[in-house]
Swiss-Prot record:
This is RNA-binding protein Hfq. Belongs to the Hfq family. Keywords: RNA-binding, Stress response. Gene3D superfamilies: 2.30.30.100. The lineage of its organism: Bacteria, Pseudomonadati, Pseudomonadota, Alphaproteobacteria, Hyphomicrobiales. Residues 10-70 form the Sm domain. GO terms for molecular function: RNA binding. The keyword Lipid biosynthesis does not apply.
Length: 79
């Protein structure tokens, strides 16, 4: 189950990275971050906004909301 969850997470982050979709990321402490994912790995997400980069650790992330519908899989219609 953990492997499938990691795969879905990777597919989502890679899709928004490739399509340069703006995200709003809410942290567990309530802080709201916005920007575009430029890179990610198993532990962190690199977010860019206004030419500045922020390295956000995944364990601190509560929710990620894309600014537009995301089509993650072939043949899937964006919602």
């Amino acid at each position: 189950m953990a492997e499938r969850s990691q795969h879905l997470q990777d597919v989502f982050l890679n899709t928004v990275r490739k399509q340069k979709i703006s995200l709003t990321i809410f942290l567990v402490n309530g802080v709201k971050l916005t920007g575009i994912v430029t890179s990610f790995d198993s532990f962190c997400v690199l977010l860019r906004r206004d030419g500045h980069a922020q390295l956000v650790y995944k364990h601190a992330i509560s929710t990620i909301m894309p600014g537009q519908p995301v089509q993650m899989f072939e043949g899937e219609s964006p919602e």
